[in-house]
């Protein structure tokens, strides 16, 4: 019986750690010409594949692009209506996360 309690206690400690080990983290920055999207799992590894969806401030899909092999994607601002800000979503199939760029974020990095 004590072996069962020890096993149960061990599993209780391990399960939360392994559940959080694969959280996807997304970051996006602007250099005035493009948005640079970076996606990494909480263990530091880049996703092998995934999609980047760019939505406007009203959640209208503007474009969908594939992630590069290093977990990044450069999204040109030319042709995107970013006046209301942008929502950058990354979906790897089993994990997803997003980053919000406000109009102020974009203007600040573009010097306007």
PLM features per residue range, with description:
Residues 63-77:
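Glycine-centered loop-to-beta-strand initiation motif
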Residues 42-48, 81:
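A short beta-turn/strand-edge loop motif at beta-sheet boundaries
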Residues 1-8:
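Bacterial N-terminal signal peptides that target proteins for export
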Residues 14-18:
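N-terminal signal peptide c-region/cleavage motif recognized by signal peptidases
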Residues 82-96:
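Short, aromatic- and glycine-rich surface loops/edge beta-strands on solvent-exposed regions
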Residues 19-36, 40, 58-59, 100-112:
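Beta-strand-rich domain onsets/edges
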Residues 51-64:
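Short amphipathic beta-strand segments in non-cytosolic proteins
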Residues 23, 34, 47-51, 85-87:
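Exposed beta-strand and adjacent loop surfaces of beta-rich binding modules
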